Every structure is written in C-alpha cells, then in structure tokens.
Amino acid sequence: MIRSRWIPGPEPRGDGPVVVSRTDFRVHRIVDLPRACLAGWRLSGLWPELAGAIGVWLWADLPRRRIGSVSVWRAESDLRAFVRHPLHVEIMRAYRDRGTLTSATWDSPAAAGRR
C-alpha cells in the first residue's frame, strides 16, 4: 500500500470534534487506474485552500486496483461543500462507471486530525 504525506488544509487541527471521511474506489479495469490516481492527486491540490479542510491522506493499493482517501473536516457542511466543488463533480462523473466507490463518514474527537 502506498500512502501520501499528510496534506494540510487551511483549518487548524484544534481541540474540538471533527468529521472524518473515508473513500475507497476500486476500478473495474487496470487500464483506468493511472488516470484515476492522477485525478485524486489533482483534487488534493485543492486542499490548502478548501474552507473547513483540516487535511487529507491519499492511499493506493495498486495490486487490488483500489485508491482512496481519509479526509478530516471542521464540519459536515464543509465536507458537503467539497463534494459539490466543480472539480470533484467533474471527476466523479468521469469515473462513476469505471469502478465501485464506497465511503463512510463519522464524527470523531479532534485527535483524529492529529498524526
């Protein structure tokens, strides 16, 4: 498994509760994996300026054709705003038929946003 460094957002980690989101995308065909990985890296470039973003890790399990992220947010409304971001929408539309996406979101103490 490959994991990125922690990519910080503009929000401080703080002491309050946070929202954590985990995504796991498994591409149907190996040929789609490189571009899907690049799309994820492209999205991570938004992190330093995303309102409410505390940070994100990206990961890839290449033998299993899986990629994903664990992101930490100040509030669920901030996560929802990211989901509506034009670049995120564009990428999701481009890949929705090329794999299977699972995700989970939960509230957690602020320690989840600390390394």
Question: What is each of the regions a protein language model found here?
Answer:
Residues 76-104:
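An amphipathic, aromatic/His-enriched active-site/gating alpha helix that lines ligand/cofactor pockets
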